[in-house]
């Protein structure tokens, strides 16, 4: 298989970029070990990851890389006061399981989250990768899809479309189909759990007709299915750098109602690099076959970073085979970074950049107030309750899937953000305030 993800000229250019460190002011010398090692020496980085995540990432290799640069790495024990384990310049974490358990009123998890938040509140100088309110938004598909819809409306880029979606909060009744049609969805569509983390979050279904709705188990989110020639592009983001990995996805299906039985599948299994099944076997390429556009991916990644204040996340993107538009179908907090060979280097570079103040959190952008007003108005129009208790929140276009033949990856480097290129504080505050779930972490 070709090691290039994109067409030859584009791919070669990006492969060369993958071998180099991001060219940001102040970090060029760091790549040679001098300036960075001097600056990082004596810094302390704490981390909390599950044992499974530590093994999967081989995180001890990152700890060793840090130690070679003079950085002390501390594995945090949240059952003990974090204050006693400090001081800490940076904390890296994946508390998704703990947060979800805390939301279920698990006393031990509630205590862990409280202790973590208590330390954050007492030490605003400590950099958190990533903020808990943002993680809570990404754990909720309905909220993250609404965020994507708002970002799409803000960007006004015809190359981007956000799939129509609905949240179902109770069993579907007689009015559900009318509500689905009213909100712009059409068969077939994908049904997913609202919670975007854990084993169950990968269990999905393709619904082809009204009969298939009977098997839907709320609470869940339904999202329009967009044919994309069985290719999924996973974008793994680390600060201002990202890597695009091509994966298998679901094959094309005819638009409109059909007598097909619903298809139940595990998206994790379908989109594995080595996946091969009838669900991913493409009969033929239909319509257009567009490759991801670097500028589009860069702008989507930047908008998400600035709206949520996140650094470690993944974006699942498909290309509509009728329009060539990029559709974001899922966002994941701190993914597995499979296929990202330079993850640890990118992470350390990002930590250095943040500590040096080279990654601006937010700056001024003229139209942020207009976006807040526009998105607020649309939000009001898009929430309605049916007599059956179904709650719908519609997205503005159509799309979703997972698939591909190659596990090749290509590294794409971001340029350093300029002072006037970020989303304004009011936009960031608006997104987080309206989309993040209530939690003790806020």
Give short role names for the model-derived ranges:
Residues 2-56, 60, 85-88, 95-99, ...:
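Active-site nucleotide/adenylate-binding loops and adjacent lid/helix of ATP-dependent enzymes
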Residues 66-86:
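A short, well-structured beta->alpha microelement
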Residues 67, 120-122, 306:
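Anion (oxyanion) recognition and catalysis
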């Amino acid at each position: 298989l070709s090691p290039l993800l994109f067409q030859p000229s584009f791919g070669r250019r990006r492969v060369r970029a993958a071998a180099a460190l991001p060219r940001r002011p102040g970090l060029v010398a760091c790549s040679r070990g001098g300036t960075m090692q001097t600056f990082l020496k004596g810094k302390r980085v704490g981390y909390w990851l599950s044992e499974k995540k530590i093994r999967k990432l081989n995180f001890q290799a990152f700890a060793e890389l840090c130690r070679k640069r003079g950085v002390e790495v501390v594995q945090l024990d949240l059952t003990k006061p974090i204050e006693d384990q400090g001081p800490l310049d940076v904390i890296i974490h994946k508390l998704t399981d703990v947060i979800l358990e805390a939301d279920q009123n698990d006393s031990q998890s509630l205590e862990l989250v409280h202790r973590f938040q208590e330390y954050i509140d007492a030490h605003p100088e400590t950099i958190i990768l990533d903020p808990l309110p943002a993680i809570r938004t990404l754990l909720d598909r309905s909220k993250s899809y609404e965020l994507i819809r708002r970002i799409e409306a803000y960007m006004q880029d015809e190359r981007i479309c956000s799939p129509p979606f609905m949240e179902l909060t109770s069993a579907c009744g007689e009015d559900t189909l009318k509500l689905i049609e009213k909100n712009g969805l059409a068969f077939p569509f994908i049904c997913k759990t609202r919670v975007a983390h854990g084993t169950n979050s990968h269990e999905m279904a393709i619904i082809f007709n009204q009969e298939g709705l009977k098997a839907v188990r709320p609470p869940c989110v339904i999202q329009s299915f967009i044919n994309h020639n069985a290719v999924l592009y996973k974008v793994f983001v680390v600060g201002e750098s990202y890597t695009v990995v091509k994966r298998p996805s679901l094959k094309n299906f005819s638009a409109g109602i059909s007598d097909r039985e619903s298809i139940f599948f595990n998206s994790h299994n379908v989109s594995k690099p080595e996946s091969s099944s009838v669900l991913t076997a493409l009969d033929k390429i239909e319509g257009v076959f567009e490759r991801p556009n670097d500028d589009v991916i860069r702008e989507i990644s930047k908008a998400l970073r600035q709206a949520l204040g996140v650094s470690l996340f993944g974006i699942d993107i498909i290309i509509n085979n009728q329009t060539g538009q990029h559709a974001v179908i899922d966002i994941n907090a701190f993914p597995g970074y499979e296929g990202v060979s330079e993850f640890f280097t990118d992470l350390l570079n990002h930590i250095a950049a943040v500590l040096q103040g080279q990654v601006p959190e937010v700056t001024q952008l003229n139209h942020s107030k207009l976006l807040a007003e526009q998105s607020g108005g649309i939000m009001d129009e898009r929430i309605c309750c049916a007599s059956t208790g179904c709650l719908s929140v519609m997205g503005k276009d159509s799309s979703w899937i997972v698939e591909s033949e190659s596990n090749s990856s290509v590294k794409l480097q971001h340029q350093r953000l300029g002072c006037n290129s970020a989303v304004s504080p009011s936009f960031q505050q608006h997104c987080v305030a309206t989309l993040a779930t209530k939690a003790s972490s806020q």
